[in-house]
Amino acid sequence: MAMWNRPCQRLPQQPLVAEPTAEGEPHLPTGRELTEANRFAYAALCGISLSQLFPEPEHSSFCTEFMAGLVQWLELSEAVLPTMTAFASGLGGEGADVFVQILLKDPILKDDPTVITQDLLSFSLKDGHYDARARVLVCHMTSLLQVPLEELDVLEEMFLESLKEIKEEESEMAEASRKKKENRRKWKRYLLIGLATVGGGTVIGVTGGLAAPLVAAGAATIIGSAGAAALGSAAGIAIMTSLFGAAGAGLTGYKMKKRVGAIEEFTFLPLTEGRQLHITIAVTGWLASGKYRTFSAPWAALAHSREQYCLAWEAKYLMELGNALETILSGLANMVAQEALKYTVLSGIVAALTWPASLLSVANVIDNPWGVCLHRSAEVGKHLAHILLSRQQGRRPVTLIGFSLGARVIYFCLQEMAQEKDCQGIIEDVILLGAPVEGEAKHWEPFRKVVSGRIINGYCRGDWLLSFVYRTSSVQLRVAGLQPVLLQDRRVENVDLTSVVSGHLDYAKQMDAILKAVGIRTKPGWDEKGLLLAPGCLPSEEPRQAAAAASSGETPHQVGQTQGPISGDTSKLAMSTDPSQAQVPVGLDQSEGASLPAAASPERPPICSHGMDPNPLGCPDCACKTQGPSTGLD
């Protein structure tokens, strides 16, 4: 595979391929340029980090094989392999800080601390596979060596560019042997695709690894016509095919040919134009008329990676659910019912018998479509699991993010993957927002072997709508979207979004602020309400700095930075709101005598622009047109 040299000045100026030395020999990888003692420290730090990141038995073979390959990659003596294996098994973890200090004192790393990141990335990608656990390790090592994680994004992009320039020559014998093997694999691939068509598409892409060559059309889709012409070598074809999926089509090439079980619609829609070594899939929770009638609308500000998709699923039923929500918005016009509802929520009384009669009278409006979507979201999640397990997306890390029923899709996707072999190394991070799923730790325990990076549970303690749909079982059931998941694991991060999300519908309306709150990068120029700002509307003091801050997000992605769940009192996050807007109640734990917010006052009801009734639940189409302060119950 291609190798690039350590940069002299800035990262974008470094060469993409190895430069020959004066004698015509290729330049050695930067990791091998370190002294033997520092190469030992480099490998030892990787071993210790692996043991801390992946202590589960399911990951032991990966850690052992990774360290064996790294020892060989760094040309260390085989005598050190037992020591490195011991480090990867959890022995000697107290020496991590010592190894970090040794590496930071190395003259090469003093000039350019990205050397280790660059070398470890090259090693992780040398076989055309980018395991999610390897990327988590690279991120962790990058943070330990005090290198901004944005530098890793630059290096990954440069590696992708370097693949365009691979021009490895093949001998006639090697070429003939390769073509013979490819013909066999081609027929096998055609057979599998035929079976997939009969089976409804569940095994499409099963040969997304090295089994199929990258066709010219697929290569042009990824890197353009000029770049495709440069990928004529076996190494370039193998790496690109393995990383980006069968025939280069990736997720955009997947289309469910036939109905699978209860699923009627399942397809991936691109959110971005580029390609990246790691991808993000966003899952929307419902559709509504107006601004949120498309699957991509809530994710306009998402910038977690250069290659992002949204899952389009069961639009008919999600639209019915959205219409049901709007019906409830129009039906709860009575101010007495509104005040009673607010008082009920503020008092923390959410048992079925305490819900206002006016709300219970229209319960069937929401219960029926909600129940249908609950069932279908579980089926869609299981189908998504098989798509990811078949490597339709290629062999690269995947981040999943979803809100409401979209988070439920991801939850059942992880459940299904956990039951299959070889489920490790595919999923990097998952972000579940307002998830209508079980919150008991025992149900989340299997996710530890599936997710390599972070498991973020974003919840709102004052989400009355989620409480209402679970009103008959909320006493026995812990709902993840209402409270933290008490699983003691370095992956799990519970983020209390009560100060950002005033109700369930805000998960779509406040997505930009939510993404920043959970540490996901967003595009610059988006305000807290998810509205695109004009160039002159950024803060006048330091507009460029503000844009940069918005682009990188408020919280950098550091693997394992949160140990266990965050308590509800310490994880409240500030939300920038309109100065005229009344303070939103922070949750259900307030005292019995808590006063009602200003929005509940009969003198100043928020009037819905539908022209019919007040808007107590925050209609997404007219929330920006309400008169007077409106904390709402959306």
From Swiss-Prot:
Keywords: Coiled coil, Membrane, Transmembrane, Transmembrane helix. GO terms for cellular component: membrane. It comes from the Eukaryota. Pfam families: DUF726. It is found in: Membrane. Belongs to the TMCO4 family. This is Transmembrane and coiled-coil domain-containing protein 4. It comes from Homo sapiens (Human). The gene is TMCO4.
